[in-house]
Amino acid sequence: MDKSESTSAGRNRRRRPRRGSRSAPSSADANFRVLSQQLSRLNKTLAAGRPTINHPTFVGSERCRPGYTFTSITLKPPKIDRGSYYGKRLLLPDSVTEYDKKLVSRIQIRVNPLPKFDSTVWVTVRKVPASSDLSVAAISAMFADGASPVLVYQYAASGVQANNKLLYDLSAMRADIGDMRKYAVLVYSKDDALETDELVLHVDIEHQRIPTSGVLPV
């Protein structure tokens, strides 16, 4: 063997991969795949807990529909005797109602108990005739006819029942801001008297943007 052949053979020996070196990338790839799967599961778990349209923030992550914002109303029912009812029409601020032709897409009711809450209440929102005086008899009939979904909110030791929200989609009805005065929040105190300081209802009304919406949540 001459010198050139010896040099070439040496180079070939140096280029030969060491034992086990081919399996290293496969092992790393497998570990990467496992890690990716774990991250994917973690992301799904986190996504499930992120604020959505049903979350108290209402527009926390998904935000309102394009071109929409929302206005919130807070209602504090007065004392309601056991087995009795309360009703309140949706009255938006004048700065919003002057744009009465802007469409409303969704209404969400959130029930927030105060520390003294230990009752069971039924909550709903209904379109009611302008002539209705929201008397006990009228509200009772609306709860009984089954024409609207009802949120049953019960006392929870944790302070907040897991399901404390009710969402109404009005998109198909082409309802507008002017129609909101035709809707009312209704409450039925089923098992116990509801005291004035026991419950707060937050009503979020998602509607098309208006010129004053720069001061509203986005």
From Swiss-Prot:
It comes from the Viruses. Residues 1-28 are annotated as: Disordered. GO terms for molecular function: structural molecule activity. Keywords: Capsid protein, T=3 icosahedral capsid protein, Virion. The keyword Manganese does not apply. The N-terminal arginine-rich stretch does not seem to be the major RNA-binding region that allows formation of an infectious ribonucleoprotein complex. Belongs to the cucumovirus capsid protein family. This is Capsid protein.
